[in-house]
C-alpha cells in the first residue's frame, strides 16, 4: 500500500497539484449554489395576494422618480432634512462626482448631530472603499458607522456568490427612497455622458409610527441586515494627512452643493409632490449569505397569477428552469405578460445580453411578448405592473442571481395613479422597441432607431455565447 502511495506522489507534479487545488476551489465556489432551493411550505401557505391591496387611503404617499437629475436632487434634499438618523443601503458606492456629493451631504449631516449608518455590498465595498480617503474621512466623523456586507475573501469561496443588492435611503423613520439606483454618477446627476436610466420611489408617512406601514418594514429589514455577523465594520484606524485633506475637500463641496442644487435646500411640499396610496408593502429575499430560497420570485409570480395583464421592466432576462415554468404557468392561466428589456445593442450588461441571444427563442416560447428597447441610454429599471392598480418597483432583476443568490427588495404599491404614470412611460418605451412577430419577423416601433454593433462587439458576443453556457446560473 505504501508503495502505491509513493508511485502516486511521484506522478503528482507541481502543475498537477495546482490544477487539483484549482478544481477544488472552483467546486467550493459554485457547488453551494448548483441546486436551487424551494420555497418553504409555511411561506407558501401564509402568502395571500389580496393582503397587498387596501380598501381605502393608507398612511403613506408615494412619488415616482424617473430621471437621474431628480434622483440626486431628492437624495440631497432628504439628507438635508434629516434630524435624527440617516440609513443608506447600496450595492455600489463610488467616490466619483455624484458619490462625493452624497458623502459630503452625509458628512455635513453628521456634523450637525445626525446619526448616519451606511451598508455597502462586500464586493464593491472591498474594491471601492478599501483605502479610499473619502470614505475614510466620512467614517471618521462622530456618529457615522459603515458596514460591509459579506466582504469578499479568497479564503471563503463559498460566500463569494451571495451579494447585497438592496438600494434605499431612510430618513428619520418618516420617509425613504427605494429602487434600483446605485450611488454613483452612472445613476445620479448629469456628470457622465454614459448613463443608466432607472426608476425608484419616494415614500412619505403621513401618520407617525404606524407599525404596519412600509417604512417600518424597511427599517426592520435593515436592522436584520445590519446585525448579521457577515456585516463587518469599516473603520478608519488612523487619520492621515490625505484623509484630512479629503475631509476639507468634502466640507468645501457641501458649499458647492448648496449653490449648485439650490432647489434641494428649500422647503418641499411632500403632499403636493406625492400620490395617495391604498397600501404599500415590502417584498424581500432571505438575507443570509448563502444559497437562498426564491421568496421574492415566488411572491411576484403569485401576485402576477391574480392579474389579467402584466408588464415587466428588467435590464436583462436570465431564466432558470423554475422561472421558465412560472412564465408557462402564467400563460396557461391566461395571463397576458409583456417584458421590456434592453436591445442587445444598447444593453450595459454583457452577461445578460449574451444569455438573451442564447435563450430568446425559449423565452418567446413561454408566450411572453419581449420588447427589446433601444433607448438613448441603457435601462436599469426593475418594475412590474399588474392591471391598473398594482405597481412593484425595486432592485429585482429577472435573473437567477436575483432569484437565488442576492438580497433583493421590491415595493408593492396599490396605487392606480402610480400605475397609470408608469404605464404611460412603458407605452413610450414600447414605441422605441422591437418585438418578434408571430410570422418570425421583427416588428419595429415608430421610435425604434437601429444601432449597428461594431465588428469587435459582434465577435465578442459570438465568443461569449459559448463561454456563458456552463456559467449562466451564476451571471
Give the positions of each predicted feature.
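Charged, low-complexity intrinsically disordered terminal segments
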Residues: 2-144, 154-162, 171-475
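Lumenal/extracellular "mature" regions of secretory-pathway glycan-modifying transferases
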Residues: 147-149
Amino acid at each position: 500500500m505504501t508503495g502505491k502511495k509513493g508511485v502516486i506522489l511521484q506522478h503528482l507534479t507541481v502543475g498537477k497539484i495546482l490544477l487539483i487545488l484549482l478544481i477544488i476551489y472552483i467546486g467550493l465556489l459554485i457547488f453551494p449554489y448548483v441546486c436551487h432551493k424551494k420555497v418553504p411550505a409555511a411561506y407558501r401557505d401564509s402568502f395571500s395576494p389580496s393582503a397587498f391591496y387596501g380598501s381605502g387611503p393608507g398612511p403613506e404617499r408615494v412619488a415616482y422618480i424617473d430621471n437621474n437629475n431628480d434622483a440626486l436632487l431628492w437624495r440631497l434634499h432628504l439628507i438635508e432634512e434629516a434630524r435624527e438618523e440617516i440609513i443608506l443601503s447600496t450595492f455600489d458606492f463610488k467616490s466619483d462626482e455624484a458619490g462625493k456629493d452624497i458623502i459630503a451631504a452625509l458628512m455635513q449631516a453628521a456634523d450637525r448631530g445626525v446619526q448616519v449608518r451606511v451598508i455597502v455590498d462586500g464586493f464593491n465595498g472591498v474594491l471601492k472603499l478599501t483605502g479610499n480617503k473619502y470614505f475614510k474621512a466620512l467614517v471618521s466623523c462622530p456618529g457615522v458607522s459603515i458596514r460591509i456586507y459579506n466582504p469578499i475573501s479568497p479564503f471563503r469561496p463559498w460566500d463569494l456568490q451571495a451579494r447585497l443588492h438592496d438600494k434605499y435611503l431612510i430618513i428619520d423613520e418618516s420617509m425613504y427612497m427605494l429602487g434600483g439606483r446605485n450611488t454613483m454618477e452612472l445613476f445620479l446627476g448629469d456628470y457622465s455622458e454614459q448613463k443608466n436610466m432607472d426608476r425608484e420611489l419616494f415614500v412619505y408617512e403621513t401618520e407617525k409610527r404606524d407599525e404596519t406601514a412600509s417604512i417600518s418594514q424597511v427599517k426592520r429589514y435593515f436592522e436584520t441586515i445590519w446585525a448579521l455577523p457577515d456585516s463587518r465594520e469599516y473603520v478608519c484606524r488612523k487619520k492621515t494627512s490625505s484623509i484630512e485633506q479629503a475631509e476639507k475637500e468634502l466640507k468645501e463641496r457641501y458649499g458647492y452643493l448648496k449653490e449648485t442644487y439650490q432647489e434641494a435646500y428649500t422647503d418641499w411640499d411632500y403632499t403636493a409632490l406625492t400620490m395617495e396610496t391604498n397600501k404599500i408593502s415590502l417584498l424581500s429575499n432571505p438575507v443570509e449569505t448563502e444559497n437562498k430560497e426564491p421568496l421574492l420570485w415566488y411572491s411576484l409570480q403569485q401576485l402576477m397569477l391574480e392579474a389579467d395583464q402584466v408588464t415587466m421592466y428588467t435590464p436583462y432576462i436570465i431564466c432558470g428552469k423554475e422561472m421558465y415554468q412560472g412564465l408557462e404557468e402564467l400563460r396557461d392561466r391566461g395571463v397576458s405578460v409583456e417584458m421590456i428589456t434592453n436591445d442587445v445593442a444598447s444593453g450595459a450588461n454583457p452577461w445578460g445580453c449574451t444569455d438573451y441571444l442564447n435563450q430568446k427563442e425559449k423565452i418567446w416560447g413561454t408566450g411572453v411578448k419581449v420588447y427589446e428597447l433601444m433607448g438613448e441610454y441603457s435601462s436599469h429599471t426593475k418594475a412590474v405592473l399588474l392591471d391598473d392598480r398594482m405597481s412593484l418597483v425595486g432592485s429585482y432583476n429577472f435573473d437567477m442571481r436575483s432569484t437565488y443568490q442576492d438580497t433583493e427588495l421590491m415595493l408593492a404599491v396599490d396605487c392606480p395613479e402610480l400605475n397609470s404614470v408608469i404605464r404611460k412611460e412603458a407605452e413610450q418605451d414600447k414605441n422605441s422597441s422591437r418585438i418578434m412577430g408571430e410570422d418570425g419577423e421583427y416588428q419595429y416601433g415608430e421610435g425604434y432607431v437601429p444601432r449597428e454593433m461594431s465588428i469587435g462587439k459582434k465577435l465578442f458576443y459570438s465568443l461569449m455565447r459559448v463561454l456563458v453556457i456552463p456559467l449562466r446560473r451564476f451571471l
